[in-house]
Amino acid sequence: SEGTSCYIYHGVYGICKAKCAEDMKAMAGMGVCEGDLCCYKTPW
């Protein structure tokens, strides 16, 4: 599932990774990520 696109909320998408970069936020428990984290940046 590494590299899969994950949807956070309207207009914000992330990418599934085992570990997120320090400048990115992490959302755990997303089905599409199959146990990985969804790493994303907010646009504001």
Curated annotation (Swiss-Prot):
Keywords: Alpha-amylase inhibitor, Disulfide bond, Pharmaceutical, Secreted. The keyword Oxidoreductase does not apply. Disulfide bonds join C6-C38, C16-C33, C20-C39. The keyword Secreted applies. Residues 7-10 are annotated as: Inhibitory motif. It is found in: Secreted. Its main location: secreted. One of its GO terms (cellular component) is extracellular region. One of its GO terms (molecular function) is alpha-amylase inhibitor activity. Is structurally homologous to beta-defensins. Mammalian alpha-amylase (AMY2A) inhibitor. The recombinant peptide inhibits porcine pancreatic (Ki=0.17 nM) and human saliva alpha-amylases (Ki=7.7 nM). It does not show antimicrobial (tested on fungi and bacteria) or channel modulating activities (tested on 18 voltage-gated sodium and potassium channles). A synonymy between H.magnifica and R.crispa is controversial. Belongs to the sea anemone alpha-amylase inhibitor family. This is Alpha-amylase inhibitor magnificamide.
